[in-house]
Amino acid sequence: METFPHVFQYPFAVLQQQESGFPLRGRWHTDFFHNDHPIVLELGCGRGEYTVGLGKRFPEKNFIGIDIKGARMWAGAKESLQEGMSNVAFLRTDIELLDRFFAEGEVAEIWITFPDPQMKKVGKRLTGTRFLSLYDKVLERGGRIHLKTDSPFLYTYTKALVELNGLPVHEITDDLYGKGCVENEILGIRTYYEQQWLERGLTIKYISFGLGEPDCEYREPDIEIEPDSYRSYNRSRRSQAVPS
């Protein structure tokens, strides 16, 4: 992937060698995308099929898929390059370093698609307070966070956290495809991975919410949540997007 012009590989060891920091931080609009369209991130993008799917569906927005495992994103990077998609890029790095790659207010939306719910490690949950404070450093005021998950545990946890902290909720459903309460553009993008769980009878949960006031201290919900069977499913296959 070193030859792909829209793929940036900056794990922590590489970033440390850059005395001036990541060159596109605060300059994604002017120096890479060459437009002022909203920037949308997909965290833990895997093979990149959802990032590419969003890029096709929303040409008026810029999309950046982020994952630490570079081999995963090769498929999405190749497809977007072959199709000449100028609104898609990929970044190989740790999500914990997000503010080293994006300036304050540079990001309009964040997608978190089917992450590990981290049932035993609160600090690693991508919708937990630790990460919300990180997103605060890059997300514009009024920006949105989107979570799609098949994990009842993570959905319940995120819903409780949002309610406890009084965060604005834009859309929420515990059965995304069964109740049809969200915009069709979101329903129209399914990864193979997502389709697989639907065929097994799992429901997809979705919540779109905003952040709190600047510099607010987020609180963790003090509730007991029953663990789910997230680990019992084969999650190794994440291939092409499947149209609905």
Swiss-Prot record:
InterPro entries registered for this protein in UniProt: SAM-dependent_MTases_sf (IPR029063), tRNA_(Gua-N-7)_MeTrfase_Trmb (IPR003358), tRNA_methyltr_TrmB_bact (IPR055361)
Pathway(s) per entry: tRNA modification; N(7)-methylguanine-tRNA biosynthesis
MF (Gene Ontology): tRNA (guanine(46)-N7)-methyltransferase activity
Keywords assigned: Methyltransferase, S-adenosyl-L-methionine, Transferase, tRNA processing
Top EC class, one word: transferase
Stated family: Belongs to the class I-like SAM-binding methyltransferase superfamily. TrmB family.
Any one GO CC term of the record: tRNA methyltransferase complex
Source species, domain of life: Bacteria
EC number(s) on file: 2.1.1.33
Record-linked SUPFAM superfamilies: S-adenosyl-L-methionine-dependent methyltransferases
Taxonomic lineage from the root: Bacteria, Pseudomonadati, Bacteroidota, Bacteroidia, Bacteroidales
Active-site positions on this chain: D116
Residues that hold S-adenosyl-L-methionine according to the record: E42, D67, D94, D116
Function as written in the Swiss-Prot or TrEMBL entry: Catalyzes the formation of N(7)-methylguanine at position 46 (m7G46) in tRNA.
Family matches, as PROSITE patterns: SAM_MT_TRMB (PS51625)
Catalytic reaction(s) noted: guanosine(46) in tRNA + S-adenosyl-L-methionine = N(7)-methylguanosine(46) in tRNA + S-adenosyl-L-homocysteine
Binding site for substrate: K120, D150, T191, Y192, Y193, E194
Gene: trmB
The protein's name in its UniProt record: tRNA (guanine-N(7)-)-methyltransferase
CDD domains found in the cross-reference section: AdoMet_MTases
